[in-house]
Amino acid sequence: MSVIFNASVNTKSAVEYQTISSTQSHSAEEQSERLHKWISKDQLEKLYSSFLNTPERHVGIDELRIILEELDITFNDSMYTRLFLKINQNRDFKVDWNEFVSYLIFGFQEEDPSSQKESLILPISGPPMVRKSEHRSAICCLALLKAKSDQVPIDEVTETINFSFGGEDSPEASGMWVTASHEGMMRFWTSHMEPIRTASSESICMSYAFFNNGKVHSKLILGDYAGNVRVLSYSPHLRGPFQAKPGAALIEVVWSDILRGKIPQFFPKEYINLHNEMVSCVYFSLHMNALFASAEYRNTKKYRGRCPGMIMVTYDERSNFRIPLGVSTFFVAESHNIVVTGGPDTFVRIWDVYIPTEPSAILTGHNGGIVLVFVQPEENKVYSVDYQKIIKVWDLHEHTLLQTYGDLVRLIHHSETDLTYYYHSHLRELVVAGRKLISIKCCPRVRVDLTDGNTHAAPVSVVLYNRLFRNIVSCGLDSYIIVWDPWTGRRKIIMKSCHTKMIYGEIIDIEITAACFDPLEQFLLTGARDGSLKIWNYNNAVVVRNMSIMPDQEVTAVIWVVDRILAMGWDRQVTEFNDVVGREYGDPKKWPKFHTDDITCADVKLGEGVVTATYSGEIIFWKLETGQPYRRYSVMDPTRFIELKLTAEEEKFIRQSKRLASRLTHSGNHSLQTGRAGRSTVLNRPEDNRDYGTDIPISVQAVLFLQTRPQTLKHGSVFISLDTGFIQVYSHHQRGGYIVEFLAVHKTGDCVLTMCTDRKNRYLYTGTAFGYIKVWYIVNFCVPESEKTHVCMPKLRLEFIFLRKELFMTRAKRAVRNQAEPLLVSSYKGHLKAINSIAFINLPKIIFTGSHDYSCRLWTQGGRYLGTLGTVLPWSRLTPFERAGDDNHLYRMPPDIKKVASSTTLKVISGIQAETSIKISNGKTVEDREEETAQTEDVTELRKLLDKPVKEPIVGKHFELPGRSILDQHIELDTTQSYIAVFTQLKVHSTEMLERLPTPAVVSRVQTENYMDHYIPVEGKVDVSGSAINIKQPSRRRSDKASDTRNVNTLGARDHVPLDFSSSHASQS
């Protein structure tokens, strides 16, 4: 199908837009896509001179083709048309030199790897984890008992990946936390801040550097109050000097003995008076074989700003990094050859380790002294923490501020300032220790065993495929517009905060709810929840035009046809904007208001009509050219004729407009005043506050026009999806109407939220609220008998594994077993949450869906999973010229779907059907035949081992299971419902009441006894003058059972009990 648009009124050339045919050359098509790589410098200079020689410095579609052919750059008609539309961004069908060069620049920008590094979410986006420190006093030291070193030999350094397979938080992989306080108490914690054990020791601060392989000597660096730095080197082989020696559980040694060589395993080295003040931080880099030491110089009168805040020592050569007030903390990133410093002057400085004279960048923004800095080299981010507990995140290359995190001020008391920080590079966690332990995730890795990653930072609302640039555009509720290359999985362009609104001085992002392309697919139109509309040149993220419907009314659907833009939403009417040069900034045209509720969806049939549907189930068909309605239906009673009648509010508004117009007719300024009065009346119309009553309406979730079906009475050309799970089919003919409906879901409460078809309307693709993707074969559905064609089921079974027979009829097939048409050819669960948008790419046969679970996924038409846009995993190479999916390829399942997938979903996504028993001619199954073969082989092996056959019984006397009953019990399952209740198939036998035995006499006597008969109270009196409690013997109570020997013995025992409580009373006092 091709659509022809005239280039302009004055030109005779026409631009023909059509999709790619499969017969085109891949190499030639690739050349047009990569023109910025194929063109040379000499050719570019000749092109520039050709543009200068033109009369108006711009050329048309034919002139540009002649200029390119003179430089041996040739294309066929289809490819050249696509190339011209990409270059002509002004839509005037004239190309100047600036447009041509801009197209070449955009080609280089798409390949910029820095665009792939921009994160969708803030580096610190998760809530912190807080727990008690279990120390009596505040924690003064925090360290990590590492299992693996952060420093890796250069020959073992590989490309860092931003995902993990789980298990990295185990103690064997991530190590244990160690906290110490001033009272000499040490506690060991897991990576999840769970206590392990407690020990007593003295707190001390050191720095330790080692390799995992043990081939390089480990370094223990010590700094003291006098500015001295000592390095203790030893070999970690066989635990080095820390080997256990018999008879010596503890070895005490002083530094002087180590210098004398009494312990030969140690190799000491001293740097006396390296600093003039107390050493604040030390580090030894094994990559550069360099020692870093820093100190604070707060006495400005003494040092006058010429203090060596940090010193790097390499082979007895010192490099001084002079920083005013010195350095409190630093971080060395060996992979980038940089060091980041922070000190009391509130500045964060980035240095090249080989250029100590001047920093590469100075990051400003803190209001307090810097107490911690660390770098994530793989993410190109710098984190800094100041004395006021404010965390700032910076971009390492751009030197810009990315985030300011201030939740520590809320979690920690303002009087608690002496905190200890430690960054775990393996888990990417920042741990803050004081009277509490707080763990903060800093740009955590993606767990690929749980998810494939996210496409957006919020639910995806719209996904579109651009046939001109061959890319996917996704819009989300996070107010992001992202352009993806589906063939390589790369992210080309990301536009953040596309729709914004200022509330109380703060800029708030507005969700994008609708989007579409212009007829030539050069520009993007988006609608937001606040009623705003924007036209984007999304190749360079420039807003071309701003529009709006009624304020604070959500835009639910947008339609862009030739010279017109239609927008509708919660304002209950269609708003038409001009798209003609010179008239685009006029007042929009409001179509008549026939709807009585919010419009939820709409669609267009090019050249014929528009259909709109509301939340209350109203459907209205409109003429596209005139904007007049011609049919109206209700989905609750689709066969009933409903008169087209304006709402009471609309009739009142029209009467007021006519009355006002008649008054202004007698005045001189008729036209000017009528226009002003009309606009003021539109703005001051009252809101429609109607009462819907107690009946809950059936809302319409999605509508779809079949573009290839004609406007006749017998052709079902409009599909209406209801929230009950049914899809109704209508004819948009003036005398047409409701035709039929079918059930499109198989779970109670589910419904279809989005629909699309292929270019020839052979298949219908639906996405449901429960995350299911269904494919329907609609070639013979709602068409006249003369147009129905034969359905080749074997061919469909080869493509759709869902149609292949199974041992038991699955739930999706049971739901549609009584529906002859349309034919359900595929059904599987693609997302955990609702699917908000679905689209289809014709030539490679790819379905892509946008869901409420923040992801946009690609599938083959048969249901195989291709990938998630934005994933950190390698992308399977695709091409727009060949069909996606190879039957010989083993397909992977999304990790989140794998845990909840049914047997049908597992079969469709994996492309593998479980083996079932198949009957053969002799009446035995394949499994029985294989078992008999195995038994025959066992008997043959026994005969080889034994000379004579073994006499029966071989195993002696043993228990034998009873034989089966002669009568075969046939179970009939009740399949009338969507599920089978198992308990209805169970045989339940009635129970009889058990005979109650008489109660024994001993038990009866014990039940009638009263413990008060054996209780003798004790009367006590406290002597205030003394320190003991004097208990006096009570008088004997006369009882009938006083002669009992048990009571006498008890009383006698009480008389001999010593009653001395003085010691206990004294201890308690």
Curated annotation (Swiss-Prot):
Q: What is this protein called?
A: WD repeat-containing protein on Y chromosome
Q: Give coiled-coil spans as residue ranges.
A: none
- Organism from which the protein derives: Drosophila melanogaster
| Keywords of the record | Repeat, WD repeat
Q: Where are the WD repeats?
A: 155-199, 322-361, 365-404, 455-494, 507-546, 594-634, 747-786, 830-869
- Where is composition skewed (Polar residues) in this entry? 664-674
Q: Does the record's keyword annotation contain Membrane?
A: no
Pfam families recorded for this chain?
WD40
Q: Give the span(s) annotated as Disordered.
A: 664-688, 1033-1069
The question of whether Zinc is a record keyword is answered with no
Print the miscellaneous field: Chromosome mapping suggests that WDY is fully contained in the kl-1 region, and WDY may correspond to this fertility factor.
Superkingdom to which the source organism belongs = Eukaryota
Tissue specificity comment:
Strongly expressed in testis and weakly in the soma.
Which PANTHER family would you find in this protein's record? EF-HAND CALCIUM BINDING DOMAIN 8, WD40 REPEAT DOMAIN 95
